[in-house]
Amino acid sequence: KTSVNLPEFMGQGFSDFLKLSEVHNDSWGLALANPDSATVIKEVASAAASARFSEVISNQSAPGALLHFRWASPGLEVTHENAHPFCFEDIAFIHNGALSPYEAVKTLIAPEFESLREGDTDSELFFLYLLTEIKANGFVEGVVKGIKNLKENFEYSSINSMIINSEYLIVVSEHDPLNKPGWTDDL
């Protein structure tokens, strides 16, 4: 596995991708997936306007990475704790969407992962639940089982997400076109 930084990896498409942070401007976060651990760097600021983002994104590299620009759901605070990615050991996670009722996800989380919660988002609960399934079923099967359970038992606008570890990157593209959040413009 070769380590590269994201602008090099994405090439000319990176500047277009960065424009997304003008709308998704509540925070940005970068997870670097290395063989033994995931490292997260995040800031409560728009990536497009952040000097720190420019420095970090150009100078950090890893065999795998996740970059997230957050557009906070109404009622959820814009804080460092609520910024994505979330990580545990060598696993990092980002999510775009909304689960409902998201506090009910807490009942699915193993006690050993409950104490990892720092913020108050559905995304973090989603991640902690996936960790529960991963521990019980392995990385790939745990993610598949967790997504299937959320899809069948929760209302959601989307559970679009990415989860990475030192061996795998799983991308979930799942949304309900009939349950579009009322607070978004039709972009």
What are the roles of these predicted feature ranges?
Residues 1-187:
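Conserved short alpha-helical segments that host acidic/polar catalytic motifs at enzyme active sites
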